[in-house]
Amino acid sequence: MNLSEKAKQHVDSCRFCWMCHHICPIGNATGHERSTARARALGISLVNREAIDLSEIMDNIYECCTCGGCVHDCTTGWDPVMFTKEVRLKAALENKLPDYINKLVDNCLDTGNAYGETELSADLKNAIAAHSEKTDTVLYLGADARYKMPCQAVKAIKVLEKANVSFTVLEDEPASGAQLDFLIGAADETKKQMENAAQVFGGYKTVVLYDPTDAKTVKQLYKEYGIEVKATTVTYTSFVAGLIKDGKLNAKNTGKTVVFQDPYQLSRDLEETEEPREIVKAFAELHELFLNRSETVWAGNLLMAEYIPDVIAEVAARRIFNAESIKESVIVTACVSEYAALKSVKQDKVEILSIEDLILGE
């Protein structure tokens, strides 16, 4: 396997280091050392030394959620996410992806989303149709909201309607490239999706990115890949926080006590932590989880639930337990995928709300 020298250096530095193994949300959920960044690096180093074949470690490579908790915690600056994504790309180029990943990749290429979905729910179709006219601002919902959580996509639209914002929602959204980037890294196919989306976004003055996964991709990864977006790109939370600040979205604080679950894409990658809190504090009394802001613990997602659903359910259950342990009974999310993961856990001790639920009083 022909990894970059940078990746090899990081792999050899991580393979015998235990300092972040307690950070990994997947490792904590499985209880297996093999799920951690250290074990992943050890496996890659064995492939590099031709001791084992690349195909033998690929299940482990796809256990990484790329949340960057290990990277954030590393005092010496090593980056397991970087070498994990590079190995995924190499596996794709060498035709050594697991079958379950190949299926998701094929879906992305065929339908624009990893789930292979082509039809929207009737409610979402109607909500989109009401905003089909071209304006200066486009609300980009993303694949998870459109195909897996359409009820949340409708709520995201309703929030902007409540503020009397003039905006467009596309019936046929281009793929942002976020899912392909997760699955196969910086492949040509990933970049083509990104370039296509950037071209569509360029037809508007402002692009509001609902899903933090898409926000990270468009605002951070596009720059790394040399892709320019001519429009101004903003996260949904920063946009809504601005509406509240400008008095366009009326807020009534219910006094309900809640904790906020920071999406790592916002808090660690985009360094956006206060805007969602401004929204929450306008509608409720905000308390904090023990690990918050850049120290946040990932709570699961929809894409990985396609191939390791039991593990993702345990990841979400552990985050709910974090709230329960400090006697908090409501978690508010700003990521549709984390919301879905948390809501999927069968329990009755902690209520799961999205920011849209909080604003709309639902």
At which residue positions do the language-model features occur?
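Ferredoxin-type iron-sulfur electron-transfer modules and their immediate structural context
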Residues: M1-I61
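Short cysteine clusters
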Residues: C14-C20, C24, C64-C70, C74, ...
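Iron-sulfur (Fe-S) cluster-binding segments and ferredoxin-like electron-carrier domains
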Residues: H22-V47, T76-L93, A305-A316, N322-A323, ...
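Iron-sulfur-cluster electron-transfer modules
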Residues: A41-Y222, G226
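Conserved beta-strand elements of the Class I
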Residues: V138-L139, V259, I331-V332
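Short, conserved active-site entrance elements at the starts or edges of catalytic domains
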Residues: L139, K230-F239
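Cofactor-cradling patches in redox/metallo enzymes
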Residues: D144-T232, S267-E362
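C-terminal amphipathic alpha-helical segment
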Residues: T235-F283
